[in-house]
């Protein structure tokens, strides 16, 4: 019985240490979550303004492309696509690209499994052959997952900061735009967990290339006129990649927010489970100790009675 008591004490001590670690990790994740939520709100204001400006500048190009699409059903000739509109031009989809955002490590609850499970289901539903799609992965978990299943992984990026920066995203966007221009894929979807609140996230798959979320009607009633130098085409050639960068950066910010929320929730749950286990083990220890004392008293009383 004494050995059993020692085993229980060791389990209690070990569980307490684990609980202290998970509680510290919960606090760290909570601090990161608070920080990135504040930054995400500020970034949303910037993103909305950039979208408005780009829509205004690209309005003419969008209308020209829409008219061209109506008058010419054969848009497969890529030589007809002007460089200014390369990120706006729709073309026949022979191959789809998926930029999948996951974390670099675990301890984030169901965050990664939700994205990867939904991603595999999407591939199963939308594609008949592995030649119809190509994968790009942000995060080590996703990259390792696709490699293990033999999927066509054309690009991977590991080590995104807990609070992402534009410098990190530029490399990703440059690669994605280059692959799109070179015909590696004809459309690109960014797939990630969208942050709803601390306890909830939802899988999202948003089309990023070609840029298709610009609505000319949103700026139709505005009287803003821009002084453009040297010319509109040159400005659009510079601005459109920046807009694509802002879209992907926004998705990464959203995904990182969901990751920190999932980590906070997972560590809180682990801490609560550790406390529950400590309570259970303490009760078990007290009962075992009480039984041991009772046994000793019984033996003493029995021995005294035998002497009489």
Curated annotation (Swiss-Prot):
A Pfam match is: ATP-synt
Output the Gene Ontology cellular-component terms: plasma membrane; proton-transporting ATP synthase complex
Q: Cite the InterPro entries for this sequence.
A: ATP_synth_F1_ATPase_gsu (IPR035968), ATP_synth_F1_gsu (IPR000131), ATP_synth_F1_gsu_CS (IPR023632)
Single annotated GO MF: ATP binding
CDD domains from the UniProt entry: F1-ATPase_gamma
Ion transport found in the keyword field: yes
Cite the entry's keywords alphabetically. ATP synthesis, Cell membrane, CF(1), Hydrogen ion transport, Ion transport, Membrane, Transport
PROSITE patterns tied to this protein: ATPASE_GAMMA
GO BP term (any one): proton motive force-driven plasma membrane ATP synthesis
In its keyword annotation, does this UniProt entry include ATP-binding? Answer: no
Its placement in the membrane is given as: Peripheral membrane protein
Q: Where in the cell is it found?
A: Cell membrane
Query: Partners and quaternary state?
Result: F-type ATPases have 2 components, CF(1) - the catalytic core - and CF(0) - the membrane proton channel. CF(1) has five subunits: alpha(3), beta(3), gamma(1), delta(1), epsilon(1). CF(0) has three main subunits: a, b and c.
Q: What family is this?
A: Belongs to the ATPase gamma chain family.
The protein's matches in NCBIfam families, at most eight in alphabetical order, are given as: ATPsyn_F1gamma, PRK05621.2-1
Q: What does this protein do?
A: Produces ATP from ADP in the presence of a proton gradient across the membrane. The gamma chain is believed to be important in regulating ATPase activity and the flow of protons through the CF(0) complex.
What protein name applies here? ATP synthase gamma chain
The species this protein was found in: Lacticaseibacillus casei (strain BL23) (Lactobacillus casei)
Kindly list the organism's lineage: Bacteria, Bacillati, Bacillota, Bacilli, Lactobacillales
């Amino acid at each position: 019985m004494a050995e059993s008591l020692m085993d229980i004490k060791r389990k209690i001590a070990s569980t307490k240490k684990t609980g202290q670690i998970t509680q510290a990790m919960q606090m760290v994740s909570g601090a990161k979550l608070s920080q990135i939520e504040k930054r995400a709100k500020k970034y949303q204001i910037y993103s909305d303004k950039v979208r408005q400006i780009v829509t205004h500048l690209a309005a003419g190009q969008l209308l020209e492309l829409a008219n061209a699409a109506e008058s010419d059903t054969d848009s497969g000739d890529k030589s007809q696509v002007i460089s200014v509109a390369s990120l706006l031009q729709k073309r026949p989809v022979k191959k789809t690209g998926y930029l999948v955002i996951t974390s670099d490590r675990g301890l984030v609850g169901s965050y990664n499994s939700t994205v990867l499970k939904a991603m595999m289901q999407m591939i199963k539903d939308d594609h008949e052959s592995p030649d119809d799609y190509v994968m790009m992965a942000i995060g080590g978990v996703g990259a390792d997952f696709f490699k293990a299943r033999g999927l066509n992984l054309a690009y991977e990026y590991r080590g995104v900061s807990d609070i992402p920066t534009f410098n990190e995203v530029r490399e990703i966007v440059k690669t994605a735009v280059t692959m799109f221009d070179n015909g590696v894929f004809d459309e690109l979807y960014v797939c990630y967990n969208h942050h709803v609140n601390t306890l909830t996230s939802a899988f999202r798959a948003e089309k990023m290339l070609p840029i298709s979320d610009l609505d000319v009607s949103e700026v139709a009633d505005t009287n803003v006129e821009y002084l453009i130098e040297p010319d509109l085409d040159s400005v659009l050639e510079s601005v459109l990649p920046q807009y694509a960068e802002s879209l992907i950066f926004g998705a990464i910010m959203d995904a990182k927010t969901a990751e920190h929320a999932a980590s906070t929730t997972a560590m809180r749950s682990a801490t609560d489970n550790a406390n529950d286990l400590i309570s259970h083990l303490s009760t078990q220890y007290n009962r075992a100790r009480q039984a041991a004392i009772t046994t000793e008293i019984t033996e003493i009383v029995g021995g005294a009675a035998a002497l009489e």
